[in-house]
Amino acid sequence: MFDILIYLFENYIHNESRISIDYDSLTNDLSDIGFQRRDIYNALSWLKNLSCYKKNIIPSINPLSNKITIRIYTQEESLKLNVDCRGFILFLEQLEILTLDTREVIIERIMELDINELNLEDLKWIVLIVLFNVPGCESAYHKLENLLFNFKEDIIH
């Protein structure tokens, strides 16, 4: 399922954010590529639930909430988010890329993934996907994108 999310983000969501997608043909295309139908349906369901933030079905996120708090993770969350992942989330909060609200959306979306433990690289993708899809997080998305993809350009030799 996670591979499908990344594939969709790279090939459809990020590049064609304003284009309507036919889910039946998308499902067939993904199946033809080799993804399992169950994983396809799970990934599309995960994205549909995330899109609730975009359609304002769920109360909108306040992008200005900038209070830093310490998040106590549940046992299930700690199993899925290892120490590196939890540290990265805190790091993004300290950089003011994540707010309290977006942090909670990200954790909630991670808990919906059908994986046992998330690694740091996968977490970065999830954070990008969530910030891209939550209204009012455009600036945070661009900050994270620059941090992740332009980091090497900023190193002084």
Swiss-Prot record:
InterPro entries cross-referenced by the UniProt entry: Smg
Pfam families: DUF494
Top-level taxon of origin: Bacteria
Position of the signal peptide: none
Family: Belongs to the Smg family.
Name by which UniProt lists this protein: Protein Smg
Organism: Buchnera aphidicola subsp. Acyrthosiphon pisum (strain APS)
Source taxonomy: Bacteria, Pseudomonadati, Pseudomonadota, Gammaproteobacteria, Enterobacterales
